Amino acid sequence: MSYPQFGYPYSSTPQFLMTTNSLSTCCESSGRSLSDSAAAASAQTPVYCPVYESRLLATARHELNSAAALGVYGNPYTSTQGYGNYVTYGADASAFYSLNAFESKDGTGSAHAGIPQTAAYYPYEHTLSQYQYDRYGTMDGSSRRKNATRETTSTLKAWLQEHRKNPYPTKGEKIMLAIITKMTLTQVSTWFANARRRLKKENKMTWPPRNKCSDEKRPYDEEEEEEEEEEDSQKATIKNEKKTVDEEVVREDKALDLSDLEDFDTIESESSECELKQPFHHQPQDGHQLRQRDCVNDHCKDVILKMPLNSTVNQELDRTNICLKSGVDQCEQDVLRGRQRSGESKACFQQQQILDSKPRIWSLAHTATSLNQTEYPSCMLKHQGLSSPSSSSSSSAVSTPVCVIDRRQDSPVTSLRNWVDGVFHDPLFRHSTLNQALTNTTVSWATTKGTLIDSGSLGRSVGNPTNVKGQLPNIPHDTNKEFIAFQKSGSKMFCS
């Protein structure tokens, strides 16, 4: 019987067909030697007697019967052809193992060397199969874990380059990449996690932090990595917010400083020229500023006049009132004692430092004796018009105290009173006690001085000879003597 449809002829004699004689020959007792068995087998018909276990033979019979039932081999074989006896073995089953080389001492080769091995069965190897993983995603213990080579990582790098915006492969993509690169699933996941870390450290991160998906459970290393990425992103946002807040605070501080400077400029610019020039300093001939000395009050000693920038007019009035009240009597006593001892004039005028728009300091003596209206406003020279007619009429009467009071160049205290009355219109300065004190001071000044200063000496000592009026020509005087005396008195310190 031949089967040309399978591509090769089949012999009509079945391979497993064994007669009773041949079976009995194979199942002979073990007393016969190997050479005798071989001789008996060669004398008879060649018998194919492969050594199989009963389990394999039963399976083979089942397959043959099913194939015969399907009609592959035509009619099924009957028991007359000897198929009923090929499974039934005798009690001496060890006869099949009598052909071993270990039984015969003179056996030179294996008895199975001439039997061809069937090609239908191959051992199942996980590494050679298409899908190497079981349903839990793990490898079989027999397969070895391979290291990642340059060829395998090039495939992963290509996939990562194509998915730079979302470098998170799914489970199916990881399995596909693992099959292509012949790596394990854990190796692929770890490689992608490390690649994302490298890109993040190199500031080449072009993807937003990925949130956890509830429907897909990723490996532990991916979840841990994503948690780290989320924490890093949160820290970065917090740092950026702190930086922006600090920058805003610095900008606000700078803006406040600039606004303060602008307000200061506007305050200075709004001050008019008609305001009182109240801080003064004395300008003697040598042109140096004089410091205040020889004052009775302790707080007047070694005080240099400075201009305060942030004081108000009310504070100036209070300070001036206190200074005038406390200093008139003491200054008068100082002038009288000094004049009686050394014959030199000493003047002490106490004037506190007051606000002024210009940083120039003037002395009270220069202000009281100067009549230049271009240098001082008209409000500071209010009583000059009232005192000039009296000074012109006082040329005939020298001994009267009224004429002496009206003469501005004789008494600095009188000039101080006139100037203060012109600037500060306060009823306090018109009090009887203050007027009496000023009158007594003027009389004592006129009596102790002994001589009067003419216009030339006064002009040389003060610096304004053209505006001096009302001098008495009837009384002789010594110009050099008076000039020297006034210089000595002027060299002393005026306290204000």
UniProtKB/Swiss-Prot annotation:
Residues in the DNA-binding region annotation: 141-203
Gene3D superfamilies per UniProt: Homeodomain-like
Region span, Disordered: 203-246
Pfam families noted in UniProt: Homeobox_KN (PF05920)
Keyword terms, alphabetized: Developmental protein, Differentiation, DNA-binding, Homeobox, Neurogenesis, Nucleus, Transcription, Transcription regulation
Annotated PROSITE patterns: HOMEOBOX_1 (PS00027), HOMEOBOX_2 (PS50071)
Places the protein is found: Nucleus
One example GO MF annotation: RNA polymerase II cis-regulatory region sequence-specific DNA binding
GO CC, any one term: nucleus
GO biological process, alphabetically ordered: brain development; cell development; dorsal/ventral pattern formation; heart development; neuron differentiation; proximal/distal pattern formation; regulation of transcription by RNA polymerase II
Primary localization class, coarse: nucleus
Record-linked SUPFAM superfamilies: Homeodomain-like (SSF46689)
Organism domain of life: Eukaryota
InterPro entries hit by this protein: HD, Homeobox_CS, Homeodomain-like_sf, Iroquois_homeo, KN_HD
Tissue expression from the record: Expressed in the neural plate in overlapping patterns with other irx members, which all share an anterior border of expression. At stage 20, expressed in a subset of cells in the developing hindbrain with expression appearing above the otic vesicle by stage 26. Expression in retina cells begins at stage 28, continuing at later stages and is limited to a subset of retinal cells of the optic cup. Also expressed in the ventricle of the heart from stage 36 (late tailbud) onwards. Only expressed in the pronephros at tadpole stage.
Biased segments, Acidic residues type: 221-232
Family: Belongs to the TALE/IRO homeobox family.
Function: Acts partially redundantly with other irx members in neural patterning. Required for formation of the posterior forebrain, midbrain, hindbrain, and to a lesser extent, spinal cord. Patterns the neuroectoderm in both the anterior/posterior and dorsal/ventral axes. Does not appear to play a role in pronephros kidney development.
Protein name: Iroquois-class homeodomain protein irx-4-A
